């Protein structure tokens, strides 16, 4: 499963790679990382992802703006999009849902919960 993680915090890459070491080693999960909404869109122009995990609050293009762009790209098959935020902000969640987000996670990410959600997608 190809997963695109979009977050302006660069240490997120190390965190995901540590938590999914076994899945990366056996090839069941592949990660790509973008550190801005703009990088994510550039990646999606030439690659596909089954799942996109995007932070909501990022400098420049926010995760909500990215979500809107992703839905307009009409990717086939459409990726599942999960939004991640450090804030349990009901307003952001509602806006993301209206823009087409499939699910939500809060920071710090509960990786056991994320792995369960991945099983439902895969």
Predicted regions and their residues:
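A Lys-centered signature of the CheY-like receiver
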Residues: 107
């Amino acid at each position: 499963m190809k997963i695109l993680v979009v977050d302006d915090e660069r240490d997120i890459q190390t965190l995901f790679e540590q938590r999914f070491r076994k899945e990366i080693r056996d090839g069941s999960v592949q990660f790509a990382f973008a550190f801005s909404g703009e990088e994510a869109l550039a990646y999606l122009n030439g690659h596909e992802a089954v799942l996109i995990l995007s932070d909501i609050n990022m400098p420049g293009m926010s995760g909500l703006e990215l979500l809107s762009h992703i839905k307009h790209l009409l990717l086939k098959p459409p990726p599942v999009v999960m939004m991640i935020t450090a804030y349990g902000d009901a307003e952001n969640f509602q806006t993301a849902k209206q823009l087409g987000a499939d699910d939500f996670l809060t920071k710090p990410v509960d990786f056991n919960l994320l792995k369960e959600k991945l099983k439902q997608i895969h």
